[in-house]
């Protein structure tokens, strides 16, 4: 808990396990038993992230759109704090400078509250706000085209946002999770200090599941034992082993996270 840290908001709170996995591998208060207790009463891993319940969670999310909208407030508060206590420092050189990162989906963008908050963010020139939109085109009712067909990047450009598109589907021809491409887009967004940024990240939901990837069947219900076994095979895991986490891997990731955190904290 230090004021110069970046903030991360998982606006798609139902994807909480992706956050819990990162906290586990970083050694940030979660152990394997906590992952095994996902969505059970009293566990540290509830169905949606809860602030002050699980270490490393910046805010409670769940109602779609709440995370992105609140992140706009976080970005405004950060700028206000800097203006009060360190207004003279060049951009990027104040101990109060940090970014607010948000991951959200179509469900967040369909909500009116995000339209209002995003318009405000553009008007306020919140260059410390970076929103990654997981564009998988799937809702619980299958293809989002039945209810959501607008030009999102065009709308956000009209709000005054900086826009980028990273297409992991390569136009629907081949799926490749180009992490470097996403990283480079984030770095470009960091350079734009007079506008908030949105990165459209085109993905395939539930990839590489054998039969349910890219379908509504993978959105709001369990995959099932057969599908999970196929997924494990596709990823090179033993389909008979649950929660594989080699001790040497966990030791490495936690040491690496600690080293990077100490370096960032020291620079701050």
Region roles according to the model:
Residues 1, 12, 88-93, 98, ...:
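Conserved acidic/glycine
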Residues 127:
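Short acidic/polar active-site loop segments enriched in Thr and Asp
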Residues 1-124:
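Cofactor-binding active-site loop characterized by glycine-rich and histidine/acidic residues
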